[in-house]
Amino acid sequence: LDECAKGEVELQLGQSIRKVAHADGRFRVTLDNRIATGAALVIATGGPSIPKMGATGFAYDLARQFGLKVVEPRPALVPLTLGPDEALFRSLSGVATEVVASCGKAHFREAALFTHKGLSGPAILQVSSYWQPGEPIAIDFAPGRPKGWLLDAKKNMPRAMLPAALGTVVPARLAAALAERIDLKVELANLPNQALVDAESRLAAWPFHPNGTQGFEKAEVTAGGINTDGLSSQTMEAKTVPGLYAIGDGVDVTGWLGGYNFQWAWASGRAAGQFV
């Protein structure tokens, strides 16, 4: 704000944009109680993620008004929901464990969290940006475990049941749920080696079939948005509308967790700011 004051920036808070027009090389923005004009206009209103903070799709409407293409927006970095076929796992709400979550060629080793609606946690949020409706995701519940670790468990704890063996890798409630699905209900010593090999393979790529996401309400960012093909990669200026710029989450750029989306917003804003 100090820098804004030095640059004699005028802030208009609590104002709605009623109309934007462009004529004779200048933009005309109609607000609730005034009209602002200028040679440049920066679209910096973000995407529709987290609407309770006031987020809308205004950036896309404005971009389309000026002939810019918009890639269909969708929630990203968002929890996934599970259907009735996987209700057993929805009962694990609150259980978290380290996993490798995969979708196609994307793999993330971080924590996964079971919720009353499905799956969340960093690993799931990351993979959600790559997930498309109808696709499965795979979860490795024993990341880093050496091949044959269940056979080793059979040697080291022969009288144990499968839930106890799985409980050395994941929380007890999750171990019980996984064991129920695998359905090997005898002591490890009485299980054929191949059954344990098969169980280990299943645990390394457990399929889940999300039936959706928790939507823009829970999405940290938005995938899709103003097509980058229509913008200068150096200045963020629209190639077909001199003086019009687009930055931040309203543009079709999506980063991983860890501050990358903030960095994109700041970097793209600075790029545009050099030329406004």
Model-derived segments and spans:
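A glycine-rich dinucleotide-binding beta-alpha-beta segment and adjacent secondary-structure elements
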Residues: 13, 177-254
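N-terminal Rossmann-like dinucleotide/flavin-binding domain of flavoprotein oxidoreductases
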Residues: 1-10
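A conserved FAD-binding loop/helix module that cradles the flavin
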Residues: 47-66, 253-276
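Glycine-rich phosphate/pyrophosphate-binding beta-alpha loops
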Residues: 50-51, 79-80, 115, 119-122, ...
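Short hydrophobic core segments
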Residues: 17, 35-55, 63-64, 112-117, ...
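An anion/pyrophosphate-binding glycine-rich loop and adjacent beta-alpha core
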Residues: 68-74, 78-194
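A conserved short coil-to-beta-strand element within the FAD-binding core of flavoproteins
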Residues: 13-26
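Short loop/edge segments at beta-strand edges and connector loops
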Residues: 11-15, 31, 72-74, 214
